[in-house]
Regions:
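Short, surface-exposed beta-edge/turn micro-motifs
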Residues: 21-23, 64-66, 123-125
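Hydrophobic/aromatic-rich, well-ordered segments within soluble, folded domains that form packed cores
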Residues: 122-150
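Short linear loop/turn motifs
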Residues: 103-107, 141-144, 151-158
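A structured, charge-rich N-terminal accessory region that forms the first stable segment of a protein
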Residues: 1-50, 54
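Long, compositionally biased
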Residues: 153-194
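Internal catalytic-core helix/loop-beta-alpha segment
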Residues: 93-124
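Non-catalytic, substrate/partner-engaging modules appended to enzymatic cores
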Residues: 96-97, 117, 138, 150-165
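A glycine-rich, hydrophobic loop/mini-helix early in the fold
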Residues: 39-101
Length: 194
C-alpha cells in the first residue's frame, strides 16, 4: 500500500489515536505544500471533536520534508502542567508562565517549532512533547543516547521491565491499528474520543 499521509500517520501515531500517548511525530515528504496544508486542515476538522490536533512543526521546501505532530491537547496540557517538566523546559530555554499558571500548549509548540527550525542542535527535549517519561528524556540528554536500560519506541533509563511492557503495549496497538486500517477501517473510527 502507498505510504501516503494517512498511512504514515497510522504507522507513527496509532497510540496517540488510541489515547495511549499524548503525541506522536512523523516525517512526511511531498512537493505539494498546498496539499499538505489541506490535509492538515481536513484532519483537524475531523479529529478536533475527538480531542486530537494535527500540526506541522517543521518544514523544508528545499527537500520537501515536513515533521507532522499529532497530539491530544488535554494529555499534552497535563504533561506540560507538571512542575518538574516545567522546570526542565525552563532550563532548556522555554518561556513559561509564572508558577501556578498552566502553560499554553500552542505557545509551547511554537517554541519547540522554532528550536527545530533554527537551532544548530536537535532539541532532544522533544521527548517530553511526545509523552516520554521525563527521566528518560533527561537520561538520554545526560548520557548522549548511551547507557540506556531498554530500547524500544525510545531509549529508557529506568526500570527495563516496565519500559519493555509499555513498548510492547504501544507496538501491539500500532499493529492492530495498521491491520484495521489496511482492512478498510477509516482513521476517524480508529480515533478514540477523549
Amino acid at each position: 500500500m502507498e505510504r501516503n499521509f494517512e498511512t504514515v500517520m497510522i504507522e507513527q501515531c496509532a497510540p496517540v489515536l488510541a489515547s495511549l500517548k499524548p503525541a506522536g511525530l512523523f516525517r512526511y515528504e511531498t512537493r505539494d505544500c498546498a496539499d499538505l496544508a489541506r490535509r492538515v486542515k481536513n484532519w483537524n476538522t475531523q479529529l478536533n471533536p475527538k480531542g486530537l490536533r494535527v500540526r506541522v512543526l517543521k518544514g523544508c521546501v528545499l527537500n520537501h520534508r515536513y515533521l507532522v505532530y499529532v497530539y491530544r491537547e488535554s494529555k499534552l496540557a497535563a504533561v506540560l502542567a507538571d512542575e518538574k517538566v516545567q522546570s526542565f523546559l525552563r532550563n532548556e530555554g522555554y518561556r513559561l508562565p509564572e508558577a501556578g499558571e498552566a502553560p499554553d500548549a500552542g505557545n509551547m509548540l511554537t517554541q519547540l517549532s522554532r528550536k527545530l527550525c533554527c537551532s544548530a542542535e536537535f532539541p532532544h527535549e522533544i521527548g517530553v512533547f511526545l509523552g516520554y517519561p521525563l527521566g528518560d528524556v533527561v537520561g538520554f540528554i545526560e548520557n548522549r543516547g548511551k547507557n540506556f536500560t531498554c530500547c524500544g519506541c525510545w531509549k529508557s533509563y529506568g526500570d527495563p521491565d516496565a519500559a519493555q511492557k509499555h513498548f510492547d503495549q504501544l507496538s501491539k496497538c500500532t499493529a492492530v491499528y495498521l491491520r484495521l486500517f489496511h482492512s478498510g477501517t477509516p482513521i476517524l473510527r480508529l480515533a478514540v474520543a477523549a
